[in-house]
């Protein structure tokens, strides 16, 4: 989605209904890139003989998903920097990472997935609004979302800095 959206944005206006639709589709599927991190919780049920293999396999999938997710996020970040202030772009990316973190919670603990936006929007909206309107009833929502937000945010800062360091190396 990210490469498709990026290519489209170079030739078309982002503010059209097509641009908004493509951006919403990208945003809808972005949390899937990071979700696999939460599969680490299944390693505790793995037999001792397979734990190294399972860990290596899971981390390789997680690495690829995270990297692809951050590439897409970086593309979007660069486009935002062309259109809005630097501070607003950073805040917008932070909000996207917060939404991704909340989506990971929804998928891992409430078992919602991307397609439920289409096949069961009322049920999804109920669960989301219930947790947003009554956060004290669902402390796991806050702690899980915050944990993933800190993890995803700090990892993205490293990726952002790494891209800029490598860019500076090429200029030298």
Pin down the residues of each PLM region.
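Transmembrane alpha-helix boundary signature
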Residues: 4-9, 33-44
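Membrane-interface helix-boundary motifs at transmembrane edges
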Residues: 6-18, 78-88
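Hydrophobic alpha-helical membrane-insertion segments
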Residues: 24-31, 93-111
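Interfacial helix-loop-helix junctions of multi-pass membrane proteins
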Residues: 40-41, 106-120
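Alpha-helical transmembrane segments and their immediate interhelical/interface regions
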Residues: 49-82
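Hydrophobic alpha-helical transmembrane segments
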Residues: 58-69, 131-154
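Transmembrane alpha-helical segments in integral membrane proteins
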Residues: 67-80, 146-169
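Short, membrane-exposed interhelical loops at transmembrane-helix boundaries
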Residues: 116-139
């Amino acid at each position: 989605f990210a490469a498709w959206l990026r290519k489209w944005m170079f030739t078309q206006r982002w503010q059209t209904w097509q641009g908004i639709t493509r951006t919403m589709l990208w945003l809808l599927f972005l949390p899937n890139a990071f979700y696999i991190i939460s599969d680490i919780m299944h390693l505790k049920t793995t037999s001792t003989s397979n734990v190294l293999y399972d860990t290596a396999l899971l981390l390789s999938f997680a690495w690829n998903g995270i990297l692809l997710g951050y590439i897409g996020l970086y593309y979007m970040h660069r486009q935002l920097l062309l259109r809005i202030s630097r501070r607003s772009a950073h805040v917008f990316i932070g909000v996207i990472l917060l939404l991704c973190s909340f989506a990971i919670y929804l998928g891992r603990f409430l078992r919602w997935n991307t397609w439920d936006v289409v096949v069961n929007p009322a049920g999804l909206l109920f669960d989301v609004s219930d947790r947003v309107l009554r956060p004290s009833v669902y402390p796991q929502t806050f702690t899980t979302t915050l944990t993933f937000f800190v993890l995803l945010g700090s990892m993205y800062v490293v990726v952002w800095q790494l891209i800029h360091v490598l860019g500076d190396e090429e200029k030298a």
